[in-house]
Amino acid sequence: DPKVQIICETMGGLKPAYEFTKRALMSGKSVCTSNKELVATHGPELIQIAHEHTCNYLFEASVGGGIPIIRPLNYSLTAEKIDAISGILNGTTNYILTKMEREGAAFEEVLKEAQEKGYAERNPEADVEGYDACRKIAILSSLMCGKNVRYQDIYTEGITKITADDFKYAKVMDCTIKLLGLAKEENGGLYAMVSPFLISKSHPLSMVNDVFNAVCVHGNMLGDSMYYGRGAGKLPTASAVVSDVVDCARHIGKIITCFWDAEDVKLTNVDEVERAFFVRVEKAKEQKAKEIFGDVKEITAGVDGEFAFVTGRMSEKEFNEKAEKVGVISRIRL
């Protein structure tokens, strides 16, 4: 239909959304989408097709629901050299972690409640294993560096191993636990990951609770900026889709700039990244842990039969080698 100039795609998944979107763009019709899986998988290809046919492929709703983050990266922050993006990108997992912290409840118990309230899918794997957040940080990190970050290359870890005891320790440390999507330029390379992190209560992301999302962006001139709001739900998502429709309508016959090249980025192996770790081991292994990890900071939270501590900074590879020698109950990154 030549009268149709803008199409909204909210069906989700790759099939048949990919073919429908491609055909629409090749017909010169702009497409506005909330489909993070499609954007993360075929984003640069679809953007290129759109521009070749003087139309646009916009995807504000694919990350952060109604939070404006794609447009700021493409427009407001174009003068910045962005070197880090981190955020709470999944409302389901943030709701679960918030409830676990407030009520001291187990993961399975809170997940069941979240499913009953409609905050979690019947099959919650994409959320709780971090796959949803992985696709979102792939999109954001691609826009950050201007090249294609494949979500398949991003180290991804979910929240299924987080326990109520972890939150007891976090409280003593004046921290909380959040599932973060993280992309950072470091030592001439770029690494990206999704994982639970212990973050200080003084950090702005620590105050993002329930189904809310937030994204922190660090630039060379502006420094830190943060984008916060409802990251899921039909109305916030609809708000973002409609904002893209309006943008397309304002640019009929014109190309809206998007810095996302098809060239794949080779990510730095997370094994090389250095950080500190919070570790729990059996009490009987206390001396062995001290011998292997060296100078550690003990954390006491009234959990029987355990020795918990924070390591010094070390690479992920070094930590994993030491943890294997000791046999840890769990670890959380700082």
Task: List each model region and its residues.
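Conserved active-site and cofactor/substrate-binding residues in soluble primary-metabolism enzymes
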Residues: 2, 41, 64, 68, ...
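N-terminal Rossmann-like NAD(P) cofactor-binding module of classical short-chain dehydrogenase/reductase
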Residues: 5-8
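Rossmann-fold NAD(P)-binding glycine/threonine-rich loop
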Residues: 11-27, 34-75
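Short glycine-rich anion-binding loops that position phosphate/pyrophosphate groups of nucleotides
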Residues: 12-14, 90, 199
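Rossmann-like NAD(P)H-binding beta-loop-alpha module
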Residues: 51-132, 139
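Catalytic, metal-anchored helix/loop core of enzyme active sites in primary metabolism
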Residues: 84-86, 94-97, 113, 119-125, ...
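Substrate-binding/catalytic subdomain of NAD(P)-dependent oxidoreductase enzymes
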Residues: 111-207, 212-214, 233
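A conserved regulatory-domain signal marking ACT and ACT-like small-molecule sensing domains
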Residues: 245-334
